[in-house]
Amino acid sequence: MTTTAATGAENPGVHPRFAEALRELGIEDLVPQVRRFPEATRTAAEAAAALGCELSQICKSLIFAAWGSPLLEHSRELGGGVPVLVLMDGASRVDLELVRKELGAEKVTRARADVVRETTGYAIGGVPPFGHRTKTRVLADRSLLGHDVVWAAAGTPYTVFPMAPRDLVGHAGGTLVDVRELTA
């Protein structure tokens, strides 16, 4: 599978919400760098294969729900799982216990698909690291810093963009943490 620029007559361009986020952040010059896949890439492995990059160069944007954290407003309310965005390299898995400890939460789970869409405005597989409908707490795993450039979803499962990891974390308003699952 190859990629093409996400602009032009045959490509409708980047997701409107994501394009607006780029303008608001003053980085609209990134739009020509957005790449479009001919087929959806809903996993990090599919995206890495299509781009011809290492799996760990893919930045996954994952939404979790946290309960009972003194750091998250409304997380102690009845049914109050508060969405939290975790940015993780594509070769690694998130350790929920480490996320729970980082947030001081009682419980952390993977968010349901409807919560992901409601929180971010994007479908799973296309969630970018910034430009969401609502402001969420962002945790970025340090493993992302192992590359000069990482690729992240640009609002759809068909589009990605490149960015230096520190810039990406900064634009996302993320806090660098160690929440990667360690293998035995």
Locate each region found by the language model.
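Extended, low-hydrophobicity, polar/charged segments
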Residues: 1-184
